[in-house]
Amino acid sequence: MKKLIAIISLAIICSCSPVEEKTKETQMHADHSQTLDKGAHQPKSKSPKQMTMTTIEGNHIHIEYHSPSMRGRKIFGGLVAYNEVWVTGAHNATSISFTKDLEISGKKIEAGKYALFTIPDQKEWTVIINKNWEQHLADDYKQEEDILRFKVIPTIVDTPQESLTYKIENLDDLEGELAISWENLAIKFIIKNI
């Protein structure tokens, strides 16, 4: 009789355990589904945060930016004014960081994190590397914090670029080319390890 009671008790205990685990698992999935449903109803950012990166001979180069889209608008000379400092993205300043010193447009820049701004114009753009990468748009931009300014000539692209895009292409063991494109224009410049 004792054996029979022990077997029945063991069977009851074993049969109850999986039900509790399933209940906990079901509850966890229900909570997760609710979180997913809430997230599904939130609007997508019209200028999502993006990043591009590469490593050139051990130098990790990393760019973070917000990527606005054309959405039927005229960009250069419209949404983005000519001859004004532009964050070259949306929301916060675009940041560029690298783990080793490098050279841009003939100037040595120490490893670190910086803001990347531009001043678009119809014939020539000014590219700016600035110390203050933690700023909203160009609201706190100060020219005296620039560590580098140089000129580039924009090129017309064959296929319009709907969203602002940054790309870094490794050219060889020492150099890479940073390309920024949007609408029907692109600018490019060389980043070189020292």
Ranges and model annotations:
Residues 10, 67-69, 100-102:
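Short glycine-rich, polar/acidic loop-and-turn segments at beta strand-coil junctions
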Residues 85-135, 140:
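Mid-length scaffold segments of soluble, non-membrane domains
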Residues 1-4:
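Positively charged n-region of N-terminal signal peptides that target proteins for export
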Residues 12-15:
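C-terminal motif of bacterial Sec signal peptides marking the signal peptidase cleavage site
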Residues 19-79, 84, 138-194:
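Primarily secretory-pathway and cell-envelope proteins
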Residues 6-8:
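Sec-dependent N-terminal signal peptides
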